């Protein structure tokens, strides 16, 4: 593995050369507290950005082991770190100038769901974060001075502010993991009680619009019919009450614009856990469930 200083020298040696000279940067580099891997280099500044990976060993990141000791906690932490890295790196996107996609810093988009993603992976050795960078050029002539800014100024700040425990608010991390553990408790209770779904009272089910998955402002909170109400004791939040849907055939009935489709869509998405503030944090559906549309001669 080469040292960061060697990368810096290589960058300066290829400045103003033809764009394909960037290909020689592919490889692994040791920075003071982390390792940088340039895994794929784009063919020209207008092509898809180059693929990079950063590895931070646990000895440097120093997140408590209890944050990632089991899969549930680990997925929650991975999701939180990826969102934080994406938020901070967005501030530096296109700060380096050039043609085409020069200066872009891009991370996989995180929606409202908490998912296991390859963009952030916690292993026994440490934290891996995968992202894309547009290597800068003027036309098709290398501008390695701008890439040097990205690799030696912007990225170290992104890593420091998002992947080191000392820089991530403790309370924020605790809340993410506690929510994930409470969601797991509800999933376990569904199986024990013979239920297929749970919708907590107070949940915000409507979305802002048809092309947005964000919660609608000033929406009417969900309230379960008394006949279907159940209470579940959670690990961190305490008891929570809402609607339990049993296995079998359930008919959603009501007048026009009364929220039938909204409830059905929330149940459909309930196979995934959602982030705090989404409104559907405690809308939980059996993770083996799937949605089928009605069609002529389809038998269900």
Place the predicted regions along the sequence by residue.
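Short helix/loop capping segments that flank catalytic or ligand/cofactor-binding pockets
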Residues: 63-64, 139-142, 206-209, 253-255, ...
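Short, flexible loop/turn elements at secondary-structure junctions
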Residues: 135, 200-202, 232-238, 249
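Intrinsically disordered, low-complexity regulatory segments
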Residues: 110, 115, 181-184, 188, ...
